[in-house]
Amino acid sequence: MTQTPEALTTEQFKQAIIDKGQYYHIYHPFHVMMYEGKATQQQIQAWVANRYYYQINIPLKDAAIMANCPDQRVRQEWIQRMIDQDGEYPDGGGREAWLRLAEAVGLSREQVISEELVLPGVRFAVDAYVNFRRRASWREAASSSLTELFAPQIHQSRLDSWPQHYPWIDDKGYEYFRSRLSQARRDVEHGLTITLDSFTTFEQQERMLEILQFKLDILWSILDALTLAYVHNEAPYHSVTSKRVWHKGLFK
């Protein structure tokens, strides 16, 4: 009879989570291209427009966690993430800040909000993440947020490199990245506490690490879709038309 491996200690488990950072999308060639100043304006615009679809789904995936969570104290803390992104009326929060980034890179907010530039591969990846959060237990869903461990580095990298490489981007567009530096660190502290307290057997810890890898897969796949369309010029249906004929806004 095979003996079940012993659970990782808290520190070992935390380190295993941190080690997943080697697969974070900061290392994706598309992000490296943007960081090194090698991206065209069209490529920057495409990233901003497609990432908008991820941004507007952040409150939905956080609401899914809250809907499944019976712990009032957890909900009281988690709701701040929704407020950060949606804002408190009439403030538009992170969503509005992202639209200012879109304008800063030369897009119109109407074009971005229409989602006409959102690639199917990006839409499928984001939808898969939201649907996972709806179906998973609240603890598992919360643990998938721990890619935020690596987020301050990626936001700082944009603040460090983009103004130098892309002087045509209006400085007001960087507000979102600046705000997320502190927000992400706060969110990580809460999410990490939940995760370390919730997954205490080897099987649970192994599953949680797979969940985190799933989230990393989502982020990487988004950039894969952008690379295919805007680096290799192979957008969906490129072999038969140059028009953006893929579905848009079907599930609004």
From Swiss-Prot:
<dbReference type="GO" id="GO:0018189">
    <property type="term" value="P:pyrroloquinoline quinone biosynthetic process"/>
</dbReference>
<dbReference type="GO" id="GO:0006790">
    <property type="term" value="P:sulfur compound metabolic process"/>
</dbReference>
<dbReference type="InterPro" id="IPR039068">
    <property type="entry name" value="PqqC-like"/>
</dbReference>
<dbReference type="InterPro" id="IPR011845">
    <property type="entry name" value="PqqC"/>
</dbReference>
<dbReference type="InterPro" id="IPR016084">
    <property type="entry name" value="Haem_Oase-like_multi-hlx"/>
</dbReference>
<keyword id="KW-0884">PQQ biosynthesis</keyword>
<dbReference type="InterPro" id="IPR004305">
    <property type="entry name" value="Thiaminase-2/PQQC"/>
</dbReference>
<comment type="pathway">
    <text>Cofactor biosynthesis; pyrroloquinoline quinone biosynthesis.</text>
</comment>
<protein>
    <recommendedName>
        <fullName>Pyrroloquinoline-quinone synthase</fullName>
        <ecNumber>1.3.3.11</ecNumber>
    </recommendedName>
</protein>
<comment type="similarity">
    <text>Belongs to the PqqC family.</text>
</comment>
<dbReference type="GO" id="GO:0033732">
    <property type="term" value="F:pyrroloquinoline-quinone synthase activity"/>
</dbReference>
<dbReference type="Pfam" id="PF03070">
    <property type="entry name" value="TENA_THI-4"/>
</dbReference>
<keyword id="KW-0560">Oxidoreductase</keyword>
<comment type="function">
    <text>Ring cyclization and eight-electron oxidation of 3a-(2-amino-2-carboxyethyl)-4,5-dioxo-4,5,6,7,8,9-hexahydroquinoline-7,9-dicarboxylic-acid to PQQ.</text>
</comment>
